[in-house]
């Protein structure tokens, strides 16, 4: 059986943790930041765990993660 290819778009967006979960970047921190509070912007800078409903899709895109 041939090797499975990693979807590079997903590899750039997600990072696997040691426990098998995936981390992702949060949305809404690219532009239009003037009206957001410093606390909001600081929180948006942290990583978030991919929801359990999406884990299977991410795993299929990154078979060796």
From Swiss-Prot:
One of its GO terms (cellular component) is cytosolic large ribosomal subunit. One of its GO terms (molecular function) is structural constituent of ribosome. One of its GO terms (biological process) is translation. Keywords: Ribonucleoprotein, Ribosomal protein. It comes from the Bacteria. PROSITE patterns: RIBOSOMAL_L35 (PS00936). Belongs to the bacterial ribosomal protein bL35 family. PANTHER family: 54S RIBOSOMAL PROTEIN BL35M (PTHR33343), LARGE RIBOSOMAL SUBUNIT PROTEIN BL35M (PTHR33343:SF1). This is Large ribosomal subunit protein bL35. It comes from Synechococcus sp. (strain CC9902).
């Amino acid at each position: 059986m041939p090797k499975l290819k990693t979807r590079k778009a997903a590899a750039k967006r997600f990072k696997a943790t040691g426990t098998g979960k995936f981390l992702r970047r949060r949305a809404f921190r690219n532009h239009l930041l003037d009206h957001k509070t410093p606390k909001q912007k600081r929180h948006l800078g942290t990583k978030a765990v991919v929801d359990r409903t999406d884990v299977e899709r991410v795993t299929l895109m990154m078979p060796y993660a």
